[in-house]
Amino acid sequence: MKVWVDADACPGVIKEILFRVADRAKVEVTLVANHWMRIPPSPFINLKTVSSGFDVADDEIVKLLSAGDLVITADIPLASEVIDKGGVALNPRGELYTEQNIKSILNMRDFMDTMRASGVQTGGPAAIGASEKQAFGNQLDRFITKHHKPS
């Protein structure tokens, strides 16, 4: 089991949680981004840079992930592709995307896109607060405890 991170849009506080968990649980965490970013020295933390372009990092994650891998992303279409390939997707606010909820979440995203395209101001998400950080950490810990078997 590996953890893949859609790193370009992933908040720094979430990356820090992932870095700590990678070393503590000895789980491989790979950040995929279209630009270089600083990562701590660790045998469990990797950075894969891809070329710039629409969905290039997303496509790379889908190409590399295996069934049972965890992907950290707020990108709902990417989460849907991950689930279709047998992976698990978790957003930075601690919401687990599943086969049971991804279709309704995708429909809501598409509806909001339509609203924005028609000129309705929908606003963006609020900054990640303490409760979201805790929810993310809890979901991550539960997933790793259940699915990761250190070698």
Swiss-Prot record:
Pfam families: DUF188 (PF02639)
Entry similarity comment: Belongs to the UPF0178 family.
NCBIfam families (UniProt xref): PRK00124.1
Name of the protein in question: UPF0178 protein Shal_3046
InterPro entries: UPF0178
PANTHER family: UPF0178 PROTEIN YAII (PTHR35146:SF1)
